[in-house]
Amino acid sequence: MQPFPAVVVGGPPNSGKSVLTYHLSQWLRQQGVDHYVVRACPDGEGDWYQEAPAQQVRVLRDKGDFSSAFVAAVCRDLAHRHLPLIVDAGGRPRPEQEIIFDQCTHALLIAASDEGLAEWRQLAERHGLTILAEVRSTLSEPDLVDASAPILRGQIHGLVRQQRVAGPML
């Protein structure tokens, strides 16, 4: 049994997964929590994508292919982890890519709608992941916590690249 968790951050496209992953990782670093972020989607994003000027990002970003070799490499790395992992997953995994989730232990779900959360909840349950949080993402509505146990549920706002995120959901 793997002693370290691998928490997939999952949700539909453009729901704020990468921005939330970045801010969660920054918060964990400030708390002195050793961890590593695995970008399990070849979309060319990473911490640099959050920190670099937008014009530079447009020039440098290089989307890769979601090939079987990429999926195999991600699965291998997840299986041999030596630290807790945050796994930034793509928003539209195809069935052959879902094997990545079999290497994970937990899920943090984020979506702009209840339907998006339900879709990803089914995916997480199908792969035996323990759901830690279900977060509704909005650009302008205030943050709120609906429930803190057994699953953190609530709303987070302002998950926009290059903007600071703070609030009770983070």
Where do the language-model regions lie?
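Conserved catalytic-core segment of NTP-binding enzymes
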Residues: 91-168
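Structural motif
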Residues: 8, 84-88, 108-110
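Glycine-rich phosphate-binding P-loop
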Residues: 7-30
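Phosphate-binding P-loop
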Residues: 1-4
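Switch II (G3) loop of P-loop NTPases
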Residues: 58-62, 77-95
